[in-house]
Design a protein with these regions (language model features):
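Active-site-adjacent structural elements that line small-molecule/cofactor binding pockets in enzymes
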Residues: 1-366
């Protein structure tokens, strides 16, 4: 997991997922630091709320050597699958074969802002069909297809990946069917915003069901935990930053997922009501530290390592995706200031030097 000198080396992968809300120069610098430290990948969310990940990663391609790039997640309601493939293959060429993608139906809150009635449009069936379209188009560079959601006649592209097989993984939160489909057809599953042993046992149990149904070995899949993280020597400051930021993620979490953390969604309704009324400060204040502790990985490097080692890896997760947050990001979301929290580059260094080595010798379950 780490050589002990601050460079990441492990059978358990460690990656960084950014929210591209910083200046392009600052974002590229963060990516360069992650590359130099040996992180497996730099991912980014693919949402209208943030800057464009495809342009950012194209700009970072020739400034890095080993780190992989891709959306985590991109989505198949607001984006067309073959156009995602065109972007991926172009990025793969620019990076010399370092592109991949995690694909889902999309952020439900954002789709509501687009007035997309996604729930009545068979989202998982659409995603499954999109994964078939994308795999075909990436592998063959052309497609003829007549599906329930996507149709193509004689479509082709000059955008071809460098890799023999560009990895396509699925993103999922609620389950269980999305977890099973990922086990059946995808190169992996990345599960966002869970932090409990119960949640990850549930995820992996259903990935296994899908893999078994397809005659696949689930242990060969990339099984990621996408977690909001703040790493600092000032434990209280890290936890306060995480508390503020995580409050904004809660509305995206299905009730079933909250229940796997011992949280009844009805407990959070007053907070949701405050957000809906536009009273952000009140909503954040109603999200207490005890809830934030359940729904983030924050604290000293050693505290973060302990939570990952105890609650996440034992289920069989083999990829930790750190969605790191710092003071500028907290202020952007909430308007509130926090102190005692390092910038992203310094958090990447702290994690590589102390958090990841603290997990050495504790591989994910076989």
């Amino acid at each position: 997991m780490s050589s002990g000198n601050g460079h990441v080396q492990s059978e358990v992968r460690f990656s960084y997922c950014m929210l591209p809300d910083y200046s392009m120069a600052d974002s590229i610098e963060m990516i360069k630091v992650a590359d130099e430290l040996g992180y497996y990948a730099c991912y980014s969310v693919d949402e209208t709320w943030h800057k464009d990940l495809w342009c950012l990663f194209a700009a970072a391609a020739d400034k890095t050597r080993n780190i992989r790039f891709g959306p985590n997640v991109t989505h198949v309601f607001l984006r067309e699958p073959t156009l995602i493939c065109q972007q991926l293959a172009t990025l793969d060429e620019l990076t010399g074969g370092r592109a991949e993608a995690v694909v889902s139906t999309g952020n439900f809150v954002m789709m509501e802002q687009y007035h997309l009635d996604w729930a009545k449009r068979k989202p998982l069936s659409r995603l499954r069909e999109a994964m078939h379209v994308m795999r075909t188009f990436l592998d063959d560079g052309k497609i003829d297809f007549e599906g329930d959601f996507f149709r193509y006649t004689g479509l082709f592209t000059a955008a071809r990946p460098v890799q023999a097989r560009l990895p396509l993984k699925m993103g999922g939160m609620k389950g269980p069917r999305s977890f099973e489909v990922a086990g059946e057809i995808a190169d992996g599953l990345h599960h966002a915003l869970s932090y409990s042993r119960e949640a990850y046992d549930y995820v992996i149990d259903h990935v296994k069901i899908g893999a078994q149904r397809a005659g696949r070995n689930w242990q060969e899949l990339d099984l990621g935990a996408w977690i909001v993280s703040v790493v600092s020597d000032d434990s209280a400051a890290a936890k306060e930053a995480a508390r503020i930021l995580v409050a904004f993620y809660i509305p995206s979490m299905p009730p079933e997922q909250l229940a796997r953390h011992g949280i009844d969604q009805s407990e959070l309704q007053p907070m949701f009501d405050a957000f809906a009324a536009g009273d952000v400060a009140k909503a954040i204040n109603m999200f207490g530290p005890e809830l934030a502790e359940k729904l983030s990985v924050a604290g000293t490097p050693e505290e973060c390592a302990e939570k990952i080692r105890t609650d996440i890896l034992p289920s069989g997760i083999n990829h930790i995706v750190l969605a790191l947050a710092d003071a500028p990001l907290v202020e952007l979301f909430s308007g509130q200031s926090v102190s005692g929290v390092p910038g992203i580059s310094d958090q990447l260094r702290l994690a590589a030097k102390r958090m990841i080595p603290a997990i050495v010798g504790q591989p994910s379950a076989a």
